[in-house]
Every structure is written in C-alpha cells, then in structure tokens.
Amino acid sequence: DPLIGRPVTVFTGLAVFWAAAGYFLKLDGVVSASLMTGLLDPIPLVYRSVNFLLLPFADSSFHLTSSAQRHYEGAWLTASVFFAALFLNLAIPRFYCRFVCPLGALLGVLGRYALWRIGKKTAECSQCSLCDSRCEGACHPAGRIRIPECVLCMNCLYTCNDELIGYNTFRSASGEIVSPDLSRRGFVAAAVCGIAAIPMLRIDGRLGQNFDPALIRPPGSLPESEFLDRCIKCGQCARVCPTNVIQPDITRAGIEGLWTPALNMRTGSSGCQMNCTACSHICPTAAIRPISLEEKLGRGAFEKAGPIRIGTAFVDRSRCLPWAMDKPCIVCQENCPVSPKAIFVKESFATVRGGNLSRAKISGATVLLSDPVLQPDRLGTGDFYVMVEGGAVSARTRILSNSQNSILLASQVAPELNTSDLKKIELQVRLQTPQVDPERCTGCGICEHECPVSGLRAIRVSAEGESRQRKHSFLLKSA
C-alpha cells in the first residue's frame, strides 16, 4: 500500500470466505468447548449421525435394526451438520479436522510437548515442495513446521525423495511454530466470549423457575444443570429405546440442550415402558445414571423412596372427550400401567343433546319414537340409557340396541307407570371422567400416547413432580 508502506495481501474467491470462516470457527470452537459438550466433537458427531440419520434411513427400506420405522426430531439439522462436515472436505482437504474439530484443537495444544514429532533432519532442502503438497494438515513441513496443525499423516516422510524429513525426538532443523495461530487480542476476545456465553444464555432462567414443563428427561437423568454438563449428545439412549419415545431435543432446552435426549410421548409405539431401563445403562457419561428395575418401580430396598417419576400427567378438560364433548372414553385409564392405577374415573350421567323424548311412547322394554331420528345401533354400546320420571317412578335403564325410531331397553321400565303420568323421558349417556392421582403417577406417558384425541392430546405429561429435581414438585411438602 503506497500510503502506509505495507504489502497488500490479496484474497479472491473462496480464499476470502475460508479466511473469514476460519476466524469464526475458531471463536465458535472456544465457545463450544465451554458451552456445548459433544456438539461438534467427532465421536459424538459420528454416533449422532449414525443413530439419528443413517440407521433410520436404512430401516426405512431394509429394517436392519428395527421392525418399525423409527423417527427422530430435527433430522434435517443432524443431516446438515453431518453432510457439511463430510462435503466441505472436497473444497479444502480435512476441513473439519483443521478448522472445526475441538478434539483436534486440544491435541494441537498438547502437541508442542510431544516426545516424537515430524521435522527436518537438516535445514538444507531443494524446496521442491512435494511434502507441502501432500500434507493433510497444511502445516508446511518444508519450512517452519506448524506443530499444532500436524496430524501425523506421515505423507511428508514418504514423499521426500531426499529423505530429509523424519519422525524424531529432536526439533525440526528448519524451526517450528508451536503456538496456535491466534493473536493476543483474538485470544482475549475468544476467552471473554467463552466465559460470558453460559451466564448470558442462562439469563432466561431455564434452569430455575422458568423451566419448560414440556421437557421430560429419561428416567435416571441427573438434575438439569449437571445433566447438561455431562451429556455429549451421542444419541445412544435414543437408539436403544424400544418404543422410540426418546428424541433429540431441538428447542425446549435452549441452545445448551441441543440434541440432548427428551421424551416425546406422541412418537413411537408407546410411552416409557415400566420394565425398561436400557437408556440408563448405555449412557457413556452417566448423564442418565444406571438404575435397576427395582429402583425404577420403587420396590424392595427402594420401596420407601417410591418409583422414579419423570413427570405427572394432567387432564386437559377443554379437549377431553368425556369432559368437553360428553363422549364416552376411558382409553387413558385402561392403558395406565401403574397398579393401583394412577388414573381413575368418576361416573356421571348427562342428557344427550336433543335427547328430550317427551313425545315418545313406552311399550314394555321398547321406547317408540314419533320420528325416525336415530342412527341405527349407535346407542347399543352400553353407555347410553333412557331416564324416565313420572309419578313416584324415577328409573334409568340401559339401552341394548336401537333402530331409527325405536329403542330396545335392557329391562321393562316401571310397568305400573301410566303414560299419562310421564313427566320426563330423556336419552342420557354415562360419562366416566378421568382424574389423575399425582401420588401414583410416574409420568410414563403411555396415557398421552394412547389418547384418541389427535394433535394436542387431552392428557399430557408435564415435568412437574419429577424425582430428579424436587423443586419441580407442585405439591405442598409437610413440615
């Protein structure tokens, strides 16, 4: 530059992009190292890609590991990271290892203390640059070799025709660069960002009272803050889950909890099975601690502590069929696996809309209607009754079957009752409205999975009452 007397380095095309991306990825690597364990680490990345992407894809056609198709949330994000790490190598060899991999960065820091290292035996060299052209880490073995960038591919040893490069215990004769290529200002900026990232992202209070009640962790999970510290997002727990209910979380736990395991009761074949502890025994970091079946069910030595609870089911009365629409349904109560059941029902009777049969006539066990208004056999389910009141008689009789203009009852209705004494004839439905006992509910989610209300279920599991964090309890504790 003629104004300041310094040489100008010109970047064009992809060089501009990769130069900028390199600084960004280095900074991101520092932040990720302190904030998101396993997010870009190579081993969890491979396991996560296999578990959430490759195996489900293989099962969709060949059923290699599962008889049923397995589904995982956020598969597009997993695929994006996996294929980006794979195909960016076509632009720059070993792109992931050189610019992204946090494990490679750690090895680079420790590499300066290695006993054995690549280097020149003598400084004299023909400068053919064959070693540089074959170097996988672009660490410039022909000159001052960048020790933190060397991946020990050994290509330079086999490429040098003069055999000037060796794997020795002494330093390279042409000199070494042992420090990372990061200025003091850049180091300070990266360190400040890394240190400030966690408290800034936790300002929303997700680990306190502002926790997401829809975030259900697998049984045996540690308290949330410790769970996030340990979980490496490998996806092994989701892979071994027999019902496919464990899913990689994308949004509920925030950026700290990206790809951590959470239960989605709507997916898979059922909820969390009572006799299964597979996820707790495969977790490599004990973010989900190993538990026995006795501990999960609260039996034997664990009877006093009770079963492990991952949440509590709540009935949404605005969507529940018996509560909101006067339609008989006890699916959640029937499927509750706890004994005695955590879901019980309260019986009541409600008059069906348009069920005033004041113009009907009773003949023995048959009710004759003046108009053909009924759908044949619709009332023969055992939940419909005819309520008759008149004089001193008040009787409710179950319906066996019906035609368009007649109803057959299970027994004769008050044969001594005169037709002139009838005050009310109504068509009623027996409703069994579900109730949840929070002292018995373990949050397994089978009721939510089996609920016939599609979309937003009428009964849903919430994290309140989970065993791993007593502060999430919604019940008053005795003094």
Where are these regions (language model features)?
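Non-ligating segments of multi-cofactor redox enzymes
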Residues: D1-A479
